[in-house]
């Protein structure tokens, strides 16, 4: 179980100012979270492969293909500033 002093220490380390009321609230909430974690640690996971998510996710990518865009000038007309056939953007890196 977590106590108020531990909550105050965590708040101090995180550079957070919390009121007495918040200290009490966080003590209860963090205590409940830690109790739940302790409960989860009792679950038998023998034979269960390690995983990072409940549902297996696979990236779906499309093959790269060159596509010629017919209305280049139409897009460039909307550019706030342009240099020849390119959008001109503010410099973000120094020389």
Curated annotation (Swiss-Prot):
Keywords: ATP-binding, Ligase, Nucleotide-binding, Protein biosynthesis. Pfam families: GatC (PF02686). It catalyses: L-glutamyl-tRNA(Gln) + L-glutamine + ATP + H2O = L-glutaminyl-tRNA(Gln) + L-glutamate + ADP + phosphate + H(+); L-aspartyl-tRNA(Asn) + L-glutamine + ATP + H2O = L-asparaginyl-tRNA(Asn) + L-glutamate + ADP + phosphate + 2 H(+). SUPFAM superfamilies: Glu-tRNAGln amidotransferase C subunit. Its EC number is 6.3.5.-. One of its GO terms (molecular function) is ATP binding. GO terms for biological process: glutaminyl-tRNAGln biosynthesis via transamidation; regulation of translational fidelity; translation. Coiled coil: none annotated. HAMAP family: GatC (MF_00122). Belongs to the GatC family. Allows the formation of correctly charged Asn-tRNA(Asn) or Gln-tRNA(Gln) through the transamidation of misacylated Asp-tRNA(Asn) or Glu-tRNA(Gln) in organisms which lack either or both of asparaginyl-tRNA or glutaminyl-tRNA synthetases. The reaction takes place in the presence of glutamine and ATP through an activated phospho-Asp-tRNA(Asn) or phospho-Glu-tRNA(Gln). Heterotrimer of A, B and C subunits. This is Aspartyl/glutamyl-tRNA(Asn/Gln) amidotransferase subunit C. It comes from Gloeobacter violaceus (strain ATCC 29082 / PCC 7421).
């Amino acid at each position: 179980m977590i106590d108020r002093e531990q909550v105050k220490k965590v708040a101090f380390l995180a550079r957070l100012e919390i009121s007495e009321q918040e200290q009490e609230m966080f003590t209860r909430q963090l205590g409940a979270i830690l109790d739940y974690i302790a409960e989860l640690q009792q679950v038998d996971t023998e034979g269960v492969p390690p995983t990072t998510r409940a549902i297996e996710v696979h990236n779906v990518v499309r093959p790269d293909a060159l596509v010629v865009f017919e209305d280049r000038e139409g897009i460039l007309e909307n550019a706030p500033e342009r240099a020849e056939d390119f959008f001109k953007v503010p410099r973000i890196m120094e020389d």
